[in-house]
């Protein structure tokens, strides 16, 4: 039995959890908090979540975990069998997580936790995001899923990253930098999925306590 360890606010935890749910894999879940605690560091050397406990040991990093799940449990695949189409899904994931979410994360302190971000950082983030979002728009299909007509691991990530990026850029930069893409319509479609509804509800319910713990 797999055990997914993390907490409901995390986009990356929810990305992995959605992959497990959509593939129909049985798993346990353990809340792990706070970040950087000795107990967490013993399992996750960088003190990050999510991590997953398997019969063979512990794995960290959300994409590593999703790739393991896909290889270990090939039923209900989340990536195409065709090598080129599979690479396209991973390309979208790279744009989304490395070039968009990670960059937008520089704004989260001000957007969500009562901190401040310097004007220089705001300008740098805005410039990087505009370039990267345009690149994502050139590749993403939104027809109806991010990579085309089949739900994939790219959707498991986008469903949770898009709202965070939209909220952060709107609050800190005064503009939703994703507004030029059909993200709103995409999310409306994805939020019809029962598992997405469940995870989103848990994320929203957990968020106030998470913010309080990080701003107190």
Write out the residue ranges for each language-model feature:
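Short, solvent-exposed alpha-helical surface patches in well-structured domains
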Residues: 88-91, 185, 198
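GST-like domain detector, emphasizing the conserved glutathione-binding G-site
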Residues: 1-126, 137, 144-146
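Acidic/polar loop patches that form or flank catalytic/metal-binding clefts of enzymes
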Residues: 78, 197-199
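Acidic/histidine-enriched, glycine/proline-rich intrinsically disordered or flexible terminal extensions
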Residues: 200-216
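Tryptophan-centric aromatic hotspots in well-structured domains and transmembrane helices
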Residues: 60, 93, 161, 199-200
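Conserved alpha-helical elements of sugar-nucleotide-dependent glycosyltransferases
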Residues: 11-15, 182, 195
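GST-like fold's C-terminal all-alpha helical module
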Residues: 96-192
């Amino acid at each position: 039995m797999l055990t997914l360890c993390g907490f409901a606010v995390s986009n990356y935890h929810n990305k992995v959890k959605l992959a497990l749910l959509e593939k129909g894999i049985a798993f346990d879940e353990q809340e792990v908090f706070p970040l950087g605690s000795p107990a967490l560091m013993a399992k996750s050397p960088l003190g990050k979540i999510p991590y997953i406990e398997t019969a063979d040991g512990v794995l960290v990093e959300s994409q590593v975990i999703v790739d393991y799940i896909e290889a270990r449990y090939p039923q209900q695949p989340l990536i195409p069998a065709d090598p080129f189409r599979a690479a396209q899904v991973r390309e979208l994931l790279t744009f989304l997580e490395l070039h968009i979410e990670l960059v937008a994360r520089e704004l989260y302190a001000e957007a969500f936790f009562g901190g401040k971000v310097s004007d220089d950082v705001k300008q740098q983030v805005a410039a990087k995001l505009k370039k990267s979002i345009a690149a994502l728009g050139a590749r993403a299909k939104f027809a109806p899923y991010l990579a085309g007509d089949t739900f994939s691991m790219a959707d498991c990530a986008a469903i949770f990253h898009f709202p965070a990026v939209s909220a952060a850029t709107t609050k800190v930069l005064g503009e939703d930098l994703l507004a030029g893409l059909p993200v709103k319509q995409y999310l409306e479609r994805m939020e019809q999925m029962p598992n997405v509804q469940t995870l989103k509800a848990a994320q929203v319910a957990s968020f106030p306590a998470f913010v309080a713990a990080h701003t107190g």
